[in-house]
A protein has these predicted regions:
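PLD-like (HKD) phosphodiesterase/transphosphatidyltransferase domain
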Residues: 2-103, 187-201
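A structural signal for short, well-ordered beta-strand segments and their strand-loop junctions
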Residues: 66-69, 100-105, 133-134, 147, ...
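Signature of lipid phosphatidyltransferase scaffolds
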Residues: 161-201
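Noncatalytic linker/hinge segments flanking ATPase motor cores
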Residues: 107-113, 141-150, 175-179, 193-200
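Short acidic, S/G/P-rich loop/turn micro-motifs used as interaction or catalytic elements
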Residues: 70-85, 106-115, 138-140, 161
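Generic structural signal of hydrophobic/aromatic residues within well-ordered alpha-helices
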Residues: 4, 54, 118-121, 181, ...
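HKD (HxKxxxxD) catalytic microenvironment of the phospholipase D
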Residues: 134-178
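HKD-type phospholipase D/PLD-like phosphodiesterase module
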Residues: 104-144
């Protein structure tokens, strides 16, 4: 806890931007062949799914905001350092594109998961392009869920609590499926409360 708080206290947005070469990022314009839909099973494929969702989002022409809500475990996903770097780079590309992110955090996570999430997200909060939320009350501890939407892509996922390795993710860019998923993430956002307000000045 003290280490995370120290990192937050010492954080400097300008230093962070220089460290990851954010200002030199270029959003790709060359079309990539991405699947219209795909199923993902197991931790390795789920990591691929997270990155594929970000690719769909960055490469699409849509400037609609992202809606992210996930109470899946994060520690086992983050154990792959290469994935963690690619994921944070993908989020940086989303922000570089100019998109806004609405994220609903699971504040009932184990402390280790919470600290890991905060250390990764706090620097990105400082861009002013992220609005963090949370859901009040103790949530369902039997099932874990994931709901992501952007302008032209959506991803859903579920697993039994304690069995993340057998989770199932589904990514789609089919318009009618994306619309349904977007409505669900908007419903979730209406039930959520603002976690913090970000001021750049």
């Amino acid at each position: 806890m003290s280490g995370a708080l120290q990192k937050m206290d010492e954080f400097n947005l300008d230093d962070y931007i220089r460290a990851i070469h954010f200002d030199s990022f270029k959003v790709p314009k060359v079309p990539f062949q991405l699947p219209v839909s795909r199923q993902y099973y197991g931790l390795k494929e789920m990591r691929e799914g997270e990155l594929d969702f970000l690719k769909h989002t960055v490469l699409s022409k849509s400037m609609e905001p992202l809606h992210l809500c996930c109470d899946m475990p994060v520690e086992d996903m983050a154990q792959d350092e290469e994935f963690a770097k690619k994921y944070m780079f993908g989020l940086a590309m989303v922000l570089k594109k100019g998109l806004h992110i609405h994220i609903i955090h699971d504040v009932e996570r184990p402390m280790k998961d919470m600290m890991l999430g905060l250390e990764n997200w706090i620097p990105l909060y400082m861009t002013g392009q992220i609005s963090p939320y949370y859901l009040k009350g103790i949530q369902n501890k039997v099932y874990c869920h994931l709901h992501y939407t952007s302008g032209q892509a959506a991803m859903t996922g579920d697993c039994i609590s304690g069995h993340h390795d057998t989770a199932h993710y589904y990514l789609t860019s089919r318009r009618e499926e994306v619309e349904i998923c977007r409505k669900n993430t908007e419903y979730l956002l209406k039930k959520a409360h603002l976690l913090m307000e970000i001021y750049r000045e």
